């Protein structure tokens, strides 16, 4: 780098420091007064939320922040680009504002002398199509997330800002949220005051078709709030509700404490509202297919979502990594311990689905087989990346599409973490002659102080210390070798009395998914996945399809001279098994049609778990209801 360039950069840095320093760091002091947020959510046609925010103000410079780092997303995903029409008034008079060029979530205002109140009005232009983001408003329902409709004062911990929210809903709509209602006048609902931290943590579902079910009574009740595109989707059978109630019971038996005063499952059964699974302390945002209840046997693969998000009330909300426990929504989050936050929650989500009866044990095993196969054959990226490194993905990638996800890897702290915790369970059992297990870790780490829901952060050393309290071992090395290494993550399968095998029969999960959309999951044979249209949705790095030059986005038009269908390509794979004749594909690449030959002769391969004779079946013990 030449000297003039160095000087220029030094000057730029010097000039930028005052601007960047204008946003006051949050302080643990009370905010005087109440932040009021009033939302008009009636413009369904345009999908616009109209917002009026009112707060006390004192003369001088003031900074308003739009939430940037969103809990549960673990990343700076606050949709600032969808804030529009901002007008700020002080004592009724419009005052100019400027955006901090180095912190685009910060708005600067000079409050005039003698002023006492500031009003900020704006519109949140929610996505009109999935190409713009997650759809949050439809003719039948809406999802109001308060972080999208809030500006708040800089310089304070979010928990020290008292806030009160209200919303005007479409005529006659019902709603559900963890917040307590102060009053409803017509279609305007005003909620009781709450800390701003908890307000953002208390989103709302509202809609035309709604059903509320009590899953657990008592001083800390749990409710299932179901919204749907059509009334018929609300028709749940008693045994289906019983399985959801059993989920609550099984969580109680695991942790022995509830860290909420009440809990609200928010569940949207929809093809219109954008899909979601997002945790909160006293609620969760969930979505499922319209046939969630009405075609119970066909919708089972998505039923672990509620178990996953409910578990987060303990793991992720009550307790979370210390680097995630930030003072407000504009301080960067650290994601280093997501392999516990998300990884163990992924583990418990599937285990609790089995224990509660939301899944059968066979369904749980087949789902686990799919995860294990990923880390045996389907994650070539493990050769160069670690699970620990993927904890940077929320900030680095923000779930943007990837050309080769299995090689680039993406948020593997979920499923990779799940596999590690399965191995931890088997190790705890081995160390204690099957007297202690991961259940004991769960209760010790998350099951204290019933009724308290202030954040209780944890560190890596806390995890190790608690594991040692269950069974003494070199847990630090164990955890670090799995999260920082490039070796196998599936040791917990055989340690629990099962082995991973492949055969030509699709497992239950694959059968269910393929029966819904006629897609073809050929990852462990041709090394690709296909949509019913013939479009390639994924290609396994260095697999047969990859080595034949195929990529995501190509379209298979014909197989061995026959028009493409899922059945046709599966028949071709079966016919080529044990022969020397390649499979011939006609492939559309942009505006070209090419013939591609894949020299693969291994037949169809799908993952399954198979019992190891003579070895104790610890997996069935893990899945058994308590």
Where are these regions (language model features)?
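Solvent-exposed coil/turn segments that connect beta secondary-structure elements
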Residues: 69, 112, 123-125, 170-172, ...
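Extended catalytic-interface subdomain
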Residues: 313, 340-361, 371
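Intrinsic-disorder/low-complexity, polar/charged segments enriched in Ser/Thr/Lys/Arg/Asp/Glu/Gln
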Residues: 34-36, 48-52, 61-63, 106, ...
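Gram-negative bacterial Sec-dependent N-terminal signal peptides
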Residues: 1-21
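Juxtacatalytic substrate-recognition/specificity segment
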Residues: 53, 213-338, 344, 348
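C-terminal recognition in membrane/secretory proteostasis and scaffolding
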Residues: 349, 359-626
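Non-catalytic architectural context of zinc metalloproteases
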Residues: 29, 42, 52-56, 71, ...
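Early extracytoplasmic/domain-onset interaction patches
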Residues: 24-69
């Amino acid at each position: 780098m030449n000297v003039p360039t160095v000087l220029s950069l030094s000057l730029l840095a010097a000039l930028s420091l005052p601007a960047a320093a204008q946003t006051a760091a949050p302080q643990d002091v009370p905010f005087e007064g109440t932040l009021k947020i009033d939302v008009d959510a009636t413009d369904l046609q345009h999908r616009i939320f109209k917002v009026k925010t009112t707060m006390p103000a004192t003369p001088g410079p003031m900074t308003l922040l739009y939430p940037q780092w969103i809990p549960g997303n673990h990343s700076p995903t606050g949709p600032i680009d969808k804030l529009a029409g901002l007008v700020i008034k002080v004592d009724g008079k419009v005052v100019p504002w400027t955006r901090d060029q180095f912190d685009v979530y910060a708005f600067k205002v000079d409050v005039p002398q003698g002023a006492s109140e500031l009003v900020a009005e704006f519109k949140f232009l929610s996505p009109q199509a999935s190409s713009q983001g997650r759809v949050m408003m439809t003719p039948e329902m809406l999802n109001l997330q308060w972080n999208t409709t809030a500006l708040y004062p800089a310089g304070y911990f979010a928990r020290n800002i008292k806030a009160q929210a209200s919303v005007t809903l479409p005529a006659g709509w019902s709603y559900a949220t963890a917040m307590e209602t102060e009053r409803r006048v017509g279609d305007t609902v005003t909620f009781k005051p709450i800390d701003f931290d908890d307000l953002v943590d208390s989103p709302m579902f509202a809609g035309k078709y709604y059903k509320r079910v009590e899953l657990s009574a008592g001083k800390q009740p749990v409710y299932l709030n179901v919204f749907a595109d059509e009334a018929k989707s609300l028709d749940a059978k008693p045994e289906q509700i019983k399985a959801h109630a059993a989920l609550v019971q099984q969580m109680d038996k695991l942790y022995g404490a509830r860290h909420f005063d009440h809990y609200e499952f928010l569940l949207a059964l929809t093809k219109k509202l954008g899909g979601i699974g997002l945790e909160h302390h006293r609620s969760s945002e969930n979505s499922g297919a319209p046939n969630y209840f009405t075609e119970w046997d066909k919708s089972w693969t998505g039923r672990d979502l509620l178990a996953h998000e409910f578990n987060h009330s303990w793991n992720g909300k009550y307790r979370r990594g210390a680097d995630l426990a930030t003072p407000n929504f504009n301080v960067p989050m650290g994601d280093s311990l997501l392999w516990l936050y998300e990884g163990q929650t992924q583990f418990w989500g599937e285990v609790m689905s089995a224990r509660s009866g939301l899944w059968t044990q066979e369904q749980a095993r087949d789902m686990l087989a799919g995860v294990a196969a990923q880390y045996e054959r389907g994650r070539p990226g493990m050769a160069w990346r670690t699970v620990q490194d993927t904890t940077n993905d929320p900030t680095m990638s923000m779930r943007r599409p990837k050309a080769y996800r299995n090689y680039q890897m993406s948020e593997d702290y979920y499923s990779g973490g799940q596999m590690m915790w399965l191995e931890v369970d088997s190790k705890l059992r081995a160390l204690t002659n099957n007297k202690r297990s991961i259940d004991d870790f769960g209760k010790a780490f998350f099951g204290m102080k019933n009724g308290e829901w202030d954040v209780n952060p944890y560190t890596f050393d806390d995890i190790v210390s608690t594991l040692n309290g269950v069974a003494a071992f070199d847990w630090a090395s164990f955890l670090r070798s799995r999260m920082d290494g490039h070796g196998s993550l599936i040791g917990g399968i055989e340690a629990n009395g099962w082995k991973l095998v492949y055969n030509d029969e699709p497992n239950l999960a694959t059968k269910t998914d393929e029966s819904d959309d006629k897609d073809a999951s050929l990852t462990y044979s041709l090394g690709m996945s296909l949509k019913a249209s013939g479009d390639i949705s994924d290609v396994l790095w260095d697999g047969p399809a990859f080595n034949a030059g195929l990529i995501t986005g190509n379209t298979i038009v014909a197989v061995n001279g026959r028009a493409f269908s899922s059945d046709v390509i599966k028949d071709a794979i079966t016919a080529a098994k044990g022969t020397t004749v390649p499979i011939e594909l006609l492939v559309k690449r942009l505006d070209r049609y090419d013939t591609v030959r894949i020299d693969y002769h291994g037949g169809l391969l799908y993952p399954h778990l198979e019992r190891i004779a003579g070895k104790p079946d610890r997996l069935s013990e893990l899945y058994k209801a308590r």
